Amino acid sequence: IFLVINSNKQGIFYTDYKIAHIQALFTAQPNVKVASFQKLTVEFCKEIGATQIVRGLRDAKDFEYERSIGHMNHAISGIDTVFFLTAQAHSAINSSIIREMYQNGADITPFVTKPELLV
């Protein structure tokens, strides 16, 4: 699992905190590694020897955006992108909505795995 550092978005948690949270979710799966980077995704893939990128799609808007990036990534690196559809129950969830709920004290338990680790 790797986190992309998006300079256009203002997160409420530092990258190291996000990595620690994800690692805590996968303690029973020691083969799962977590990292972050501030470069092109395909450059990171080359560094770690990855040959595919896996992305989740919530809706048609995600597809259009990810398809363009996937085509460009393949053109510059030969690395393919594989898409999975998000479960319908989760398709309306996005980080901006969850962030606003969290900052306003709303219960995010139905939407976030182990939210108690966020404290």
Regions found by a protein language model. Name each.
Residues 1-119:
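Nucleotidyltransferase catalytic core that binds NTPs
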